[in-house]
Structure formats: C-alpha cells, structure tokens
UniProtKB/Swiss-Prot annotation:
PANTHER family associated with the record: 39S RIBOSOMAL PROTEIN L12, LARGE RIBOSOMAL SUBUNIT PROTEIN BL12M
Organism taxonomic ancestry: Bacteria, Pseudomonadati, Pseudomonadota, Gammaproteobacteria, Cellvibrionales
Organism encoding this protein: Cellvibrio japonicus (strain Ueda107)
One of the GO BP terms on file: translation
Alphabetic keyword roster: Ribonucleoprotein, Ribosomal protein
Entries under NCBIfam families matching the protein: L12 (TIGR00855)
Protein name: Large ribosomal subunit protein bL12
Cited HAMAP family: Ribosomal_bL12
Disulfide topology: none
Record function comment: Forms part of the ribosomal stalk which helps the ribosome interact with GTP-bound translation factors. Is thus essential for accurate translation.
Length: 122
C-alpha cells in the first residue's frame, strides 16, 4: 500500500518543528534543491521589471481652476493647436505625452503642475 499526499501531509502536521526542519534539510540533500534559492529568485523578479522601465506616460488627471494656463502648457509641450490642446485638457484624465524618458516626463509634469494641473507619471 502506498502513501497518499494526504497521508504525508497529516504525518508532517503531527511532527515537531525541529523534525520538520530536519525533514526539509534531508529532502534538499536527497533531491539537490534549496527552498531558500527559489524564494530569492521569485522575490528578485518583480524588482527587476520595475528597474527596466524606460518609457513613461504623462497623464493629465485634473485641470484645476487655471484652465487657460494648463491649455498653454499643453500646447508648449505637445505642439498642438489651440483647439486640439483645449479638447485634450477638457477630456482629462488623458495622456499628454507617451513613451518619453523619465527626465522629459518629470519636466512635463513640473510644467503642467506649475500651470495648475494635477498630473501623474506612469
């Protein structure tokens, strides 16, 4: 008669912590694996993805009460005409610039915030 997974789990549940640690060590030796190495590799994955972001989007979240100043700032940043800039501002939340470097995104954010807008960089 062979043991089922449930039998093994029940047996482990009845063991002391010391015995479980010894069991894990024995399994690591027998199968040539390490539980700690797998945890480190998984934890490092998301951090690497965040560091790789090179393109950013400047989102106009809200215009505020200085709409004219925000329209002027949008025109300067994008080169849009008056009507297009006005339409973009009135459609907030909307992307003002996409695929720009971090420095350009931060500069655009500062300019729009100075004009009175609420801005987010993604």
């Amino acid at each position: 008669m062979s043991l089922t997974k449930e039998d093994i789990i029940n047996a482990i549940a009845e063991m002391s912590v010391k015995d479980v640690v010894e069991l894990i060590s024995a399994m690591e030796e027998k199968f040539g694996v390490s539980a700690a190495a797998a945890t480190v590799a998984v934890a490092a994955g998301p951090a690497a993805a965040v560091e790789e972001q090179t393109e950013f989007t400047v989102m106009l979240s809200s215009v505020g009460d200085k709409k004219v100043n925000v329209i002027k700032a949008v025109r300067e940043l994008t080169g849009l005409g008056l009507k297009e800039a006005k339409d973009l501002v009135e459609a907030a939340p909307k992307a003002v610039k996409e695929g720009v470097s971090k420095a350009d995104a931060e500069a655009a954010k500062a300019k729009l915030e100075e004009a009175g807008a609420l801005v987010e960089v993604k």
